[in-house]
Amino acid sequence: MADSSLVGGGEEPEERVIEAALRPKNLHDFVGQHRVRKQLSLVLEASRMRGRSADHVLLSGPPGLGKTTLSMIIAAEMNAPLRISSGPAIQHAGDLAAILSSLSEGEVLFLDEIHRMSRPAEEMLYMAMEDFRVDIVVGKGAGATAIPLELPPFTLVGATTRAGLLPGPLRDRFGFTGHLEFYSVEELELVLRRSAGLLDLKVNSAGFSEIAGRSRGTPRIANRLLRRVRDWALVHGIEQIDARTASAALDMYEVDKRGLDRLDRSVLEALITKFGGGPVGLSTLAIAVGEEPETVETVAEPYLVREGLLGRTPRGRIAMAPAWTHLGYAVPEGVFGQEALALFEVEDLGVEPVAEWLPNGQ
């Protein structure tokens, strides 16, 4: 069975240690995200010139694109200590109050998955971000008293994969908001070149290209695949990694040319061979591949939808034309994805509906 964490979200403790060692330490070394990097550099430089803490920063985007790394870089660029916590760890206002009250002046507080913080903690954070003050409630009922607690100036860096779940009042309190985009293959090759240098690996250009092409546009995955290829080359006594070596290693781990892993291909295979390309409901599809519906929806579907291999419709999931081609099947007439108009719903096109899922309304 394939290592399901290879292109997924899970990381072993040892992997996290290695990943941390590969992180760039300043904006100059950070590859990609040119727009966000340029804007953030200006914000930090202006803050240093004023001799004040930087504005609060909100970073959004898919996992693995560098939100945590950028928080560390912000602290390093401001020559400030960094405190790391996460939304799920702050379920009560008291949890947040304890963290805020222990911050030193200028410290950077990084809150990962900030959208998962509890509502009482969010409301306390409003005042802390705007006025650098929180009210600590002592006692209960009619005898409860709010004691104001002054906080030193600090910089909050929030990270989220679901910016739409953040309340408007919280989003509005961030002075800078940056959205991280998926990386191009060329940018991932630059990431891999830097990592290979730090790991003292010999990789040629074709090897970098092969790994980058299977990395789903995500640096975290690219670095993970590089380490697995390194292991394969070490065991097989290969000194320089080329395209053939990288391909053989990643084929063994069941990561194909488009970055699809075992689960991704199982979902598409089931859609095509068991349900004729769909539509089929999520629960039924999950049973067909032997996984939980949540796993299919959160692990496999985002990448498959982004690549145009799977479609989500009101009636269920469907295999798009490129999925049939990628798995080596002939594309039946009328399968979505063959024409640009097939990407839109009938209501979007403003035309009369035809018989559902049949070509030319037949």
From Swiss-Prot:
Mg(2+) binds at T68. Keywords: ATP-binding, Cytoplasm, DNA damage, DNA recombination, DNA repair, DNA-binding, Hydrolase, Nucleotide-binding. It holds the Pfam family RuvB_C. One of its GO terms (biological process) is DNA recombination. Residues 184-254 are annotated as: Small ATPAse domain (RuvB-S). Residues 257-362 are annotated as: Head domain (RuvB-H). ATP binds at L22, R23, G64, K67, T68, T69, E130, D131, F132, R173, Y183, R220. It catalyses: ATP + H2O = ADP + phosphate + H(+). Homohexamer. Forms an RuvA(8)-RuvB(12)-Holliday junction (HJ) complex. HJ DNA is sandwiched between 2 RuvA tetramers; dsDNA enters through RuvA and exits via RuvB. An RuvB hexamer assembles on each DNA strand where it exits the tetramer. Each RuvB hexamer is contacted by two RuvA subunits (via domain III) on 2 adjacent RuvB subunits; this complex drives branch migration. In the full resolvosome a probable DNA-RuvA(4)-RuvB(12)-RuvC(2) complex forms which resolves the HJ. Has 3 domains, the large (RuvB-L) and small ATPase (RuvB-S) domains and the C-terminal head (RuvB-H) domain. The head domain binds DNA, while the ATPase domains jointly bind ATP, ADP or are empty depending on the state of the subunit in the translocation cycle. During a single DNA translocation step the structure of each domain remains the same, but their relative positions change. Belongs to the RuvB family. This is Holliday junction branch migration complex subunit RuvB. It comes from Arthrobacter sp. (strain FB24). The lineage of its organism: Bacteria, Bacillati, Actinomycetota, Actinomycetes, Micrococcales. The gene is ruvB.
